Amino acid sequence: MLGKYPDKIKQLPLYDGRFDAYKLMAKGSDVLFASYPAGTHIPEHTHDTDNHGVITRGELILTMNGEVTRVKQGEWYHVPANVEHAATFEVDTDEIEFWFHE
């Protein structure tokens, strides 16, 4: 069901949110091993964490500050805290997200 992750990752607790992910909690941050099926769209939203992510399979179409950026496999992106953004996934996509609490 969730991404192509090693068995140790698949033993982590599941994230209880609007997408599928395994969640690793650490002091001051969370690490999510997320999977998005093709056709997923997450509408504009904000959050109070400073987010960095790397695409490990597929592609993220990130809309932020009126600009659309395609983030491909192996590439990193950054979404600052409290900035409106949206995400679209045209193909099955896995990513590792780092959420840093302010």
Give, region by region, the residue ranges found by the protein language model.
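Conserved short histidine dyad/triad with adjacent acidic residue
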Residues: 30-47
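Glycine- and acidic-residue-biased ligand/ion/polar-headgroup-sensing regions
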Residues: 49-60, 65
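A cytosolic small-molecule/anion-sensing beta-strand core signal
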Residues: 56-57, 72-73, 91
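Short acidic-glycine-tyrosine-enriched beta hairpin
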Residues: 66-81
